[in-house]
């Protein structure tokens, strides 16, 4: 019976018995071969030498050996007396088909499980990327007009503050370190962009005219009564509004960062020392001299200056919020009294009626990018109009720089003339229509057709109205790990504003100078009706924080830019955007290259010190009246390309700093 079972097993396997691969690797004796003589044992060295012999390659051996059916170790026992050919009693194809089917079913289960798992993991990762908090603190940039304030912004980000938290702290810091440019007694505008959701908010805290201010009073006495120049400050309301929307750290903690700078002291910057030496307010008060000229003369750059008075103000604001500034408390009374004592008409009611505006920025498409900038009374539409006009020129690396400069100069003449028509749209509905025209590609094509490629226009193509703007301004640019971009520009108007300083140390602005009125000075263009003085109105502004992002998708170039210099700032921003988005230059090179600005009031084309004599001669040959100046404006910037972020200051600024978090 055992023999029959063995025979039956062998018959079932037949010629399809499995191959014993161990038999192959051990090189068994073939059935027809004679027994080989015993092979002596080799040592380890001899074995290594044998394996290294090229003639003992196993593949060569297998090819040369006369392999018949190699009996497996399991079948050799029952094959001593049997025929090598036996009847197959089981259909091998049926068995194979059944086995294959089972294998396919198992494979299907495995593949399905893997795909399901991979899909689940992918969906989870995508949701984490879009909706989860950053897992690692990395990648960000801060740029401001003072190195101390840049480092403060980085410090806030390092403590898990939001991009807006960092911007608020840095802006308040600039009011301490750069009091000639910005401060609690001024105003500004902030543009916040959420990269993930592609949403933007413009927080406009531009100063507004007091309710009792009249044009006639300014015409008569603006030079002798600095109190008339004071608008209702918007800085505190605007920063608080931004923090309410996007802040992460407590308001009091954010203000405490800046208060520490005022309390501990800071090194006087080159720009502040120069402003105190060359541009002190006319008829500076004793309080101003005590604060900024404690030794009777301007401090030297690098000397230590403390502002415990502002530290105390920030502590009060951190505890009680904007109400301490606007609701009739001691701070309000001090500001009203200081302005009225100098001939002003501002009242407590003006402060209580003030509110920051939350708006959408204007938007244009340029070279595959969205360009976001402030809406009127700011001149963002004129900036986008300039880009729309330039987009139609063949501006490539093959075009000479001189030819490109001519096109830029003629384009900016048009854009600045358009800007002179803007004002507060709440008081004039035609301004909204003008804004829509400036954003139109069709209008841009028309203006482009009016530009002569080889000759400057002998007369302006458009009527020109009076253009005024804050010559000094402070910039804060943030790209944080939270995927928010913040661009902010603030100002007091003239250096140190009106020159009026309260007992608490708050410098008051002179923003009413940005309105237009008749007979202001000799040789001024016609006053702009759109920018005339009215109670509660906000004057025309060249504060232009600007953000750029890809028009489609998330990947590509993002920019945050700001500028000072009033109308010169608009010219500077246009040329930097041209360098980055059209000529594909890096941000550092784009900020460093020479810039120009057409002064519409004098009909002079101003160029900065980076221009060569050859470039100036080319422009003069085209009919431009060129005036070379040292610096036109400072344009700072931050750039993000995919996951790489960098903050860059304008090299013309001796004190600004950009810092990048890696």
UniProtKB/Swiss-Prot annotation:
Compartments where located: Membrane
Membrane-protein topology: Single-pass type II membrane protein
Any Pfam family hit: G_glu_transpept
Cytoplasmic side: 1-106
Stretches of the chain found on the membrane's Extracellular side: 128-662
Highest taxon in the source lineage: Eukaryota
TM region(s), chain numbering: 107-127
Biased composition (Low complexity): 72-83
GO MF terms held by the record: glutathione hydrolase activity; leukotriene C4 gamma-glutamyl transferase activity
Pathway in which the depicted protein is active: Sulfur metabolism; glutathione metabolism
Protein name: Glutathione hydrolase 7
């Amino acid at each position: 019976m055992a023999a029959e079972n063995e025979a039956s097993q062998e018959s079932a396997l037949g010629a399809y018995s499995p191959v014993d691969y161990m038999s192959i690797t051990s090189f068994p004796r073939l059935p027809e071969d004679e027994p080989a003589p015993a092979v002596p044992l080799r040592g380890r060295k001899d074995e290594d030498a044998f394996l290294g012999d090229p003639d003992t390659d196993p593949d060569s051996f297998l090819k040369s050996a006369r392999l018949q059916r190699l009996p497996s170790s399991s079948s050799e026992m029952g094959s001593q007396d049997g025929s090598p050919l036996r009847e197959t009693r089981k259909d091998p194809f049926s068995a194979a088909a059944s086995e294959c089917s089972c294998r396919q079913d198992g494979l299907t289960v495995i593949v399905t499980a893997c795909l399901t798992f991979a899909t689940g993991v992918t969906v989870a990762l995508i949701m984490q990327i879009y909706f989860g908090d950053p897992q690692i603190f990395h990648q960000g940039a801060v740029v401001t007009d003072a190195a101390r304030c840049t480092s403060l912004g980085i410090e806030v980000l390092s403590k898990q503050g939001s991009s807006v938290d960092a911007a608020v702290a840095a802006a308040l810091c600039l009011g301490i370190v750069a009091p000639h440019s910005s401060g609690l007694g001024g105003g500004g505008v902030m543009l916040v962009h959420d990269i993930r959701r592609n949403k933007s908010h413009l927080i406009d805290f531009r100063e507004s005219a007091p309710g009792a201010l009249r044009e006639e009073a300014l015409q008569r006495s603006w030079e002798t009564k600095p109190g008339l120049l004071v608008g209702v400050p918007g800085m505190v309301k605007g920063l608080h509004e931004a923090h309410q929307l996007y802040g992460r750290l407590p308001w009091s903690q954010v203000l405490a960062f800046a208060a520490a700078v005022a309390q501990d002291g800071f090194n006087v910057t080159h720009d502040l020392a120069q402003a105190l030496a060359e541009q002190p307010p006319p008829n500076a008060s004793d309080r101003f001299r005590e604060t900024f000229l404690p030794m009777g003369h301007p401090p030297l750059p690098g000397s230590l200056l403390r502002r415990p008075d502002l530290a105390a103000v920030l502590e009060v604001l951190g505890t009680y919020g904007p109400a301490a500034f606007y609701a009739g408390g001691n701070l309000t009374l001090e500001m009203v009294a200081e302005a009225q004592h100098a001939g002003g008409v501002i009242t407590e009611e003006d402060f209580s009626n003030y509110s920051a505006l939350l708006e959408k920025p204007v938007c244009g498409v340029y070279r595959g990018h969205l360009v976001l900038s402030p809406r009127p009374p700011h001149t963002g539409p004129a900036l986008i109009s300039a880009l729309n006009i330039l987009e139609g020129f063949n501006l490539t690396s093959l075009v000479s720089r001189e030819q490109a400069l001519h096109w830029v100069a003629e384009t900016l003449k048009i854009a600045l003339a358009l800007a002179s028509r803007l004002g507060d749209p709440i008081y004039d509905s035609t301004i909204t229509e003008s804004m829509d025209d400036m954003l139109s590609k069709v209008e841009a094509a028309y203006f482009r057709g009016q530009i002569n490629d080889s000759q400057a226009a002998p007369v302006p193509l458009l009527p020109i109205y009076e253009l005024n703007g804050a010559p000094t301004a402070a910039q804060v640019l943030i790209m944080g790990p939270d995927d928010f971009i913040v661009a902010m520009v603030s100002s007091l108007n003239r250096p140190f504003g009106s020159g009026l300083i309260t007992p608490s140390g708050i410098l008051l602005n002179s923003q009413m100078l940005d309105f237009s009125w008749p007979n202001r000075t000799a040789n001024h263009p016609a006053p702009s009706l759109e920018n005339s003085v009215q109670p509660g109105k906000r004057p025309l502004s060249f504060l232009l924080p600007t953000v750029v992002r890809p028009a489609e998708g998330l990947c590509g170039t993002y920019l945050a830019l700001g500028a000072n210099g009033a109308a010169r700032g608009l010219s500077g921003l246009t040329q930097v955007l041209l360098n980055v988005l059209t000529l594909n230059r890096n941000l550092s090179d784009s900020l460093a290259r020479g810039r120009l600005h057409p002064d519409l009031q004098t009909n002079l084309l101003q160029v900065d010190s980076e221009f060569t004599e050859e470039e100036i001669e080319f422009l003069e040959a085209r009919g431009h009246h060129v005036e070379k100046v040292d610096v036109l404006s400072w344009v700072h910037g931050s750039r993000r390309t995919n996951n790489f972020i960098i903050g860059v200051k304008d090299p013309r600024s001796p004190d600004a700093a950009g810092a990048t978090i890696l």
